[in-house]
Amino acid sequence: MALLHVENLRVDIPLGQDTLHAVRGLDFQVERGEMLCIVGESGCGKSLTSLALMDLLPRKARRTATRLSLDGIDMLGQSERQMCDLRGNRLAMIFQEPMTSLNPAYSIGDQLSEVLTRHRKVSRKDALLRAAQMLEKVGISNATERLRQYPHQLSGGLRQRVIIAMALMCEPDVIIADEPTTALDVTIQAQILRLIRDLQKELGLAVIFITHDLGLVARIADRVAVMYAGQIVETAPAVELFENPQHPYTRGLLASIPIPGRTQPGQPLGSIPGLVPSLVGEQHGCAFRNRCPQAIPACADDVPAINGHDHMTRCLFAAPGAEPMFHREGARS
C-alpha cells in the first residue's frame, strides 16, 4: 500500500460571487523511499497542493478530497490539534525561502529543539544534542556554535540546510520540498539538491519535490507528475516520461529546453503558443485545448485519465510512439 494516497484533491478559493478552482481533482500516490517530482509553470497549483497536504491553506481556501491518507491515517478526519501532531512529526515541509521560514528573534538551537520537544518527550538538553547531530548530518560544521547563532548570521545556503535539518528532526515519513533551491545561487543549488537526494536514499524518505525546472527533475526524480491549470495531466516514471512524453503540454515543455546531446548549437528552442486559461468559474474539457495544435471538438468534453502501464495521461491523443505535437522553431515537421 502507498505511504501517501491522494484521490480527487481539490482546492477552491471564493472570489466574491465566483470561485477560483485552483487545484482540480488530483490523484497520486507516493511510496516509501520514492522521490516524486511535481513539475509545472507558475500558477499551475503546485504550491497550493503542498499547502493542502499540510492543511496550511489560506483561511478562505476550501480543501476537499475523496481520500487523503498517510500510512493509513485519514488526514481529512483529523482535528487541528491532531494535524499539528502530524506536521513536523510524520509529515514535514521544506519551504522555498529560508529567511522567511526561520524566526529572526530565536536562535537556531531554540527553533530546532522546539520541533523535538513539541513531538517527543525529551529534555531540552537532549533536543539540543539531537539538533547538533542533525546540523552535522546536513553538512554544517561547528554545529554547537551554530546552534547559538541567529538566522541573519547565516548565509542563504546554510539557512536552507537548517530548514532541512528542522524537517528531519523527528524522522518524518514524508517530506514536501516546495522549490527549496529557487532563492539560492547555482552552486549552492547543486549542493542542496545532492544533500536532499542523499538523505532521501539514506533514510528511506518519501519526498514530494515541487519545481518548475525540468533539468532538475531529470537528475533527481523517480516519478514525475506534470501539472497544468490545476490538474495533473501526465504522470510516469522519470525515464519513461522523458523518453516517451504523451501529453501535448509535456511535449511542449520538453521542446522548450535544450537537451544535451540532442540540441545542436544555435538551434532555436520551441515555444507553446497562447495563454493559460482562467480557472475562475466552472471548467469543462481539456484545459490545454486552446493551445494544442491537434485539438478537436471532443476535447471540449471532460477528458478522462488514460492509464497505460505505470503511465497516466489526460489526453484523447495519448498513445505510445505518437508523433510529437510540438516542434522546435526552425525545425522541419
Model-identified regions with their sequence ranges:
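Conserved ABC transporter NBD signature motif
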Residues: 62-74
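Conserved ABC ATPase "signature" region
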Residues: 73-74, 126-145, 254-255
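Conserved ABC ATPase signature
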Residues: 149-154, 158
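A short, proline-enriched helix->beta-strand linker immediately N-terminal to the Walker B motif
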Residues: 169-173
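P-loop NTP-binding/switch modules centered on Walker-like glycine-rich loops
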Residues: 174-180, 184-267
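Charged, flexible cofactor/metal-binding loops and thiol motifs
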Residues: 237-332
